[in-house]
C-alpha cells in the first residue's frame, strides 16, 4: 500500500504552474503528492478503491467541472478526515443564494431579490424592481466566469428570459454597487483567503487585473476591514481556500459583491496578465504545507 501526504485532483491545464509550485514545496519538505488528472483518473480510482493507495489530506480542484472525478471525491469524503475545502462545504459555497442568505445577516451585501428556479415556479408573482435602481445584475445561483450573468438589466422581461437559461437554478437580482475612488483606483477588491491568512488585492472589474494592496495603502486608506470581513466569511463558509470581492462605497460601507469563489483561479500573473500575483500563489503553497505537515507520516521518510 502506498501512502501519500496529499492527494490533489486537477483537470485545468492552467493549474500546471500552481501544481508545479506545490509539488516542489512538498518535495522540499519531504512530503508526497499524489496528482490525479484526467490522464490517470481511471487507474488511480481503481487503486484507491482497491486500497492500494491511501492519502492523509484531500484537495479537489476538478470535480466542479468534471463529474468523472466525483467517485474519488466521494471516496475521500467517506475515508479521509482532512480536506482542503471539504466537498460538502464547497457545494454549499457554490450556491450564491445560500451564501447570500448566510452572509447578508451580519455583513453588507448589495440589495438583492432572490427568485425560485423556473422549474419550481415558472410563473412569478408581481415583482417591484424599482428598489434595485435603474439597472441591476441577474445571476444564476451556480457557475462562474460570468456564465448566465446579465449585467445592466432593466426590465422584468429580461429576468423572465434569463431564469430559463438554467431552469433548475435559483436566481439573484442584485443592485449595482458603485465603488468610491481611492487615489487613482476604484475601491474594488478581490481578497484571497488561505488557511487563516488574508491577501487583499485591488481588482479592476473591467480588466480583471490584480494589484497587491501594500501595507502603506492598507494603513493610509483604512482597509483593515477587508481582512476582518474575509475572515468572517471564512468562518461562515468553512473553506480553507477561496476568494471574495468587496467594494467600498462613497459613504464608506464595505459591501461584499461576490461572496465566495471556489475553486479560485491560481494562474501566475507572470504567465497571464489577469492571473494572481506570483508571490501570493507561492505563499499559498506554503500555507497549504503548514496544513499538511502535522499529518505527515514518519514512516514515509
Regions found by a protein language model. Give the residues of each.
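A short glycine-rich, hydrophobically flanked beta-strand micro-motif that places a catalytic Asp/Glu
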Residues: 239-251
Amino acid at each position: 500500500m502506498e501512502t501519500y501526504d496529499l492527494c490533489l485532483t486537477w483537470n485545468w491545464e492552467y493549474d500546471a504552474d500552481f501544481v508545479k509550485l506545490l509539488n516542489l514545496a512538498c518535495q522540499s519538505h519531504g512530503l508526497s503528492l499524489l496528482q490525479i488528472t484526467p490522464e490517470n483518473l481511471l487507474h488511480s480510482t481503481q487503486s484507491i478503491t482497491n486500497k492500494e493507495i491511501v492519502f492523509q489530506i484531500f484537495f479537489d480542484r476538478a470535480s466542479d467541472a468534471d463529474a468523472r472525478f466525483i467517485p474519488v471525491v466521494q471516496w475521500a469524503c467517506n475515508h479521509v478526515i482532512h480536506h482542503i475545502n471539504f466537498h460538502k462545504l464547497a457545494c454549499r459555497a457554490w450556491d450564491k443564494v445560500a451564501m447570500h442568505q448566510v452572509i447578508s445577516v451580519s455583513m453588507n451585501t448589495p440589495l438583492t431579490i432572490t427568485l425560485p428556479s423556473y422549474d419550481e415556479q415558472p410563473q412569478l408573482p408581481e415583482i417591484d424592481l424599482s428598489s434595485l435602481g435603474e439597472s441591476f445584475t441577474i445571476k444564476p445561483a451556480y457557475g462562474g466566469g460570468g456564465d448566465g450573468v446579465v449585467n445592466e438589466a432593466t426590465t422584468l422581461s429580461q429576468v423572465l428570459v434569463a431564469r430559463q437559461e438554467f431552469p433548475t437554478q435559483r436566481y439573484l437580482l442584485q443592485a449595482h454597487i458603485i465603488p468610491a475612488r481611492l487615489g487613482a483606483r476604484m475601491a474594488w477588491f478581490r481578497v484571497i483567503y488561505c488557511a487563516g491568512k488574508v491577501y487583499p488585492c485591488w481588482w479592476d472589474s473591467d480588466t480583471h487585473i490584480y494589484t497587491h494592496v501594500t501595507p502603506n495603502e492598507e494603513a493610509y486608506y483604512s482597509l483593515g476591514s477587508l481582512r476582518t470581513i474575509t475572515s468572517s466569511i471564512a468562518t461562515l463558509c468553512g473553506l480553507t481556500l477561496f476568494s471574495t470581492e468587496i467594494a467600498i462605497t462613497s459613504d464608506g460601507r464595505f459591501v461584499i459583491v461576490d461572496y465566495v469563489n471556489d475553486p479560485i483561479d491560481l494562474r501566475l500573473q507572470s504567465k497571464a496578465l489577469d492571473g494572481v500575483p506570483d508571490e501570493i500563489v507561492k505563499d499559498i503553497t506554503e500555507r497549504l504545507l503548514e496544513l499538511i505537515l502535522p499529518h505527515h507520516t514518519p514512516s514515509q521518510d
